[in-house]
Amino acid sequence: MKEMLVVGRLKEGKFEKFMGFMQSDKGMAERKKVADVTKTIGAVSPDKKAVMFKIFVHNIDAMHAFVDRSNPVTKPVWDEVMESFEIFELKKVR
């Protein structure tokens, strides 16, 4: 498993829609294809325009499809709520 950090910028006023999808049965099913959801750590900026997730990825290709709009389940939601995202691979230094 790879530890990754995903930082997403949300469109104005779309935080609730984003979180609703991420916590829905449909969203959880897609997330489970990508990573171990029991280990995910999330954070949100005070203005609710940015989210950050540390995830433990077991399927890199599925993770890229999840965020880059090539996944047919996530695409309609991302088109509505997501401005941009960045993905970082994490490595422990100690």
Question: Where are the model-predicted features located?
Answer:
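Short S/T/G/P-rich N-terminal loop/turn motif that feeds into the first structured element of a domain
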Residues: 1-75, 79-94
